[in-house]
């Protein structure tokens, strides 16, 4: 039957339709003639050239507006918009100016500033590259815009660029065409029109369209069965329609706009580092000012050349303090450790696109997971067959294993017995032949790649896979071997017959039939369709016990329909009935009247199977305190059934609408959720497990609500429809088989589409964060030691103990390698048995900060002590008194004059200080193998990377001492006696930390554990966004 609307030029009466300057917004709820009248278009002739010009002026071109990318110079400047970076920049500039003012050469004065600038440029480069990659998400949407389209203009069909389409155009679409713009269906020229709109709605099945009005003012995309959406694909049928939305005023355009307005989300670690940076900058400023002020009375020291020169001298010390206090290597170490973590995750098919998302995974409290292709395989499979066993109305059920499009699986008979030759069973043999012949899909193995290629609807592909699992009866001896992997059974049946006629699937008949002529010249009709409709056309049933075709009785009919209902209610299976009949050889055409007197073959139960790993993955999430919410475009019953199969819902769980009030609110449709209003929505998320029939905006709203309640939200998805929610979530997770848009909008891509991979990624995220805390603490304590050394030297009036360039070398190179290696500390065994950490958990709490302050003070004191020891106590050193050392500026006026001043130019004391600083920090790195466990329990070789990093750092340190680089850093080689003192001063740091670890273990009567996820909804105020229906703040009591 052809579905159409009456043609002719509509009157230009006032249609009363809604007009928002963007075209007709309610075309789905309007008659075709009303839509045509709105756009003043003749359904038989289309728009005229003049109409097209006017429409283009009014609506613009059918293109998404290009986003203005951020200029490169702005991206570069953005990387320097950080408080610590600004302090370092200021220190570099001031250091250069002072060096030049004191008569140093430009080359000499540039060394320290250039080192600082190179560090900052390296970090900025990484930031710019990362942000440039993020902009690709918007551009990827263009791949879903059709290139060309067939339109009716001036009474003639024309092929034009899709960008030239305007609202009001009549477009013609056929199988394989991509819909160029949002279109109201006006004519369907085939018995059915099916659209694959999974990229927009997430529906796993192609959707059948029609021309009738949809009487539903709140219809979501899935309900608008008379609308074709831009970017979706025609998989069956031919039709015409009126374009009602172009460019950004399409469903996909609105998704793109939602992506475009997303703001950068600060991850928990980034927020903590920002807070730490702000605090550190204040501390640095205070210390620098304090050092400068404390030494004001020394500005007039004659040895410094006057008050102004004295002020400059102590200002240089303040600059050195700033350099010492800032952990310059921290950004690089954090980036390196996260990058190394991503490499490990990539080996397990979790491909991370943005480094901060690694850390965010560790504190995820909610995963909003798409069903199709994420929790399920997105590969329909026949898993049940029901047939009439005998004329006594007894039914026999068969199970079919295998849950993918790969033709591997077994057939189990009643009682679970494996059938070695399934096709020798009459009903299965006929079912396989019907599945192969009454089928328009194609499945084949590509010769070049060896991969399975498929064309057509997933239901029909599942039938081909089913036929392959059944195989051929043993009575048939094919001319050549049948290869299951090459779909040999399907090929045999197709080559054995000639298709003579086809009755396509239609909405009113709900079945499809083909007429074929076999090699034996026998003509047969093979039919498939909805069981209740096929049964009406049947007069006989194929008995499975060898009786052949027996009359279909009322008892048989009732038994078949009862089995169908059981399939649907128990496992939410989609049921399909198969039938056939032989016709005279003179029959060469098919008519609807031929679909009668059929012989019923059997029922097939099929579904989109859950991934086998999902149940255990969801169990792990539960143990780890992570809530999983299924969010899908499929219907409510199917979604709930899958939720039960993967363990998200228990089989006994009562759902919305039941009498059990304690279990209400577990499952909602998108419309039910939307109609609740802000108060109801926020309350519903507490127990929500399944949200079905959703649109993109529902996903966004869900993410907003969860984030407002303090949750750290991960959203998984694979379609264009998921992209805005992926961007809005704290971490977006796309499937590897998903669309390019989803992948570029996501923070992480699952290469194997395996939900279990998410669990591994979450665990790895927790490990990485714990290790990140360890090396951050290590670097903080090291920097505290450097600050203490500079501050103490300034207070005591000592010569320059460490120069800024030496401090930079220690911070970046010798400290950086062990800090990075700490990222490889082993995970705690109960990592996934604890709840997620709270976002506001500090990296360093009060007690830990006190511990590292003590360590830092020890580091600073022994660094200065080594310096003093060389001048006063070392026989081969300065051999001077304390007074001479602290009044080094007056050496020229002392006995010996210039000769005595030469000792203050020796490189040995500063080299000893630098070496003590390096070695003590290597020992301190060992302290950070664990927060509280002793080195006696966790030996250094437990982290071989750390041992290697310490060895490398020491080798680099020896390198600058005993090579030509010593001049650049102002150091020199040390004697055995000097190295002995360095070790004596450095090693006790382990004893100091062991004492504090023991005290820490004593004060913790129970092992430290996570405080779990977010606070209860009953305890918080929930701020609402502008998208909420209620504008007031919400407080649940």
From Swiss-Prot:
InterPro entries with a match to the protein in the record: ATPase_P-typ_cation-transptr_C (IPR006068), ATPase_P-typ_cation-transptr_N (IPR004014), ATPase_P-typ_cyto_dom_N (IPR023299), ATPase_P-typ_P_site (IPR018303), ATPase_P-typ_TM_dom_sf (IPR023298), ATPase_P-typ_transduc_dom_A_sf (IPR008250), HAD-like_sf (IPR036412), HAD_sf (IPR023214)
Gene3D superfamilies the UniProt entry points to: Calcium-transporting ATPase, cytoplasmic domain N, Calcium-transporting ATPase, cytoplasmic transduction domain A, Calcium-transporting ATPase, transmembrane domain, HAD superfamily/HAD-like
Membrane-spanning residues: 83-103, 109-129, 276-296, 317-337, 398-418, 731-751, 790-810, 852-872, 945-965, 971-991
Domain of life: Eukaryota
Membrane topology field: Multi-pass membrane protein
GO annotations of cellular component type: membrane
Catalytic residue list: 370 (4-aspartylphosphate intermediate)
Keywords: ATP-binding, Magnesium, Membrane, Nucleotide-binding, Phosphoprotein, Translocase, Transmembrane, Transmembrane helix
Compartments (UniProt record): Membrane
SUPFAM superfamilies assigned: Calcium ATPase, transduction domain A, Calcium ATPase, transmembrane domain M, HAD-like, Metal cation-transporting ATPase, ATP-binding domain N
EC number: 7.2.2.-
GO molecular function: ATP binding; ATP hydrolysis activity; P-type calcium transporter activity
Catalytic activity of the protein: ATP + H2O = ADP + phosphate + H(+)
PROSITE patterns: ATPASE_E1_E2
Family statement: Belongs to the cation transport ATPase (P-type) (TC 3.A.3) family. Type IIA subfamily.
Role of this protein: Could possibly be a calcium ATPase.
Protein name (record): Cation-transporting ATPase CA1
Lineage: Eukaryota, Viridiplantae, Chlorophyta, core chlorophytes, Chlorophyceae
